[in-house]
Amino acid sequence: MKKIFWAVATLLACAGAQAQSVVYKVDPSHTRASWEAKHFGTSTNRGQWDKTDGEITLDKTAKTGKVDVTIDMASINTGVPPFNNHLKSPAFFDVANHPTARFVGDKLKFDGDKLVEVSGDMTIRGKTNPATLKAVAYNCYMHPSLKREVCGGDFETTIRRSAFDVNWGVVEKFTADDIKVTIQVEAVKQ
């Protein structure tokens, strides 16, 4: 009986040792968040935030982890400087008082080895709401120059901007309330 106990204990200890979280640092040169919104119900306005930061923790064996991405809201870029300034103003994102947006998710869903979605909380303009980022693409590879594993993909969600108190033009339907957000991310194993 003792032999069986020690065999089971050793097996459990080895299984626990194999499951291990790995930290990946977001690569800002390969990570950005972009958005799309209908303008007066006709064309689509698009823009992106050029500066992001964050960390991803993955345990591929246990299929668990955490995603924490921060967006510098002052880095918004539509290609039209007056529009950028309008979006930074108190009418929209109020960047002076809310300089960052953040997504933190710890509910990861896998299909086999592929990450298919991350659920958590999105904070914009000081308001936090649940959000689920669905993977459009996801992969890990050994980076030829860095000689380290890089994981990344394209993740999409649709948010209702009024839920974050970004209300300018919603009633008048100048710009849609539902905004498609895509986060393109690559993160380097530390």
PLM features per residue range, with description:
Residues 19-190:
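Low-complexity, acidic/polar, glycine-enriched regions of mature
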Residues 9-18:
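Hydrophobic h-region of N-terminal signal peptides that target proteins for export
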Residues 1-4:
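Positively charged n-region of N-terminal signal peptides that target proteins for export
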Residues 6-9, 183:
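Short helix-onset patch at the extreme N-terminus, typifying the N->h transition
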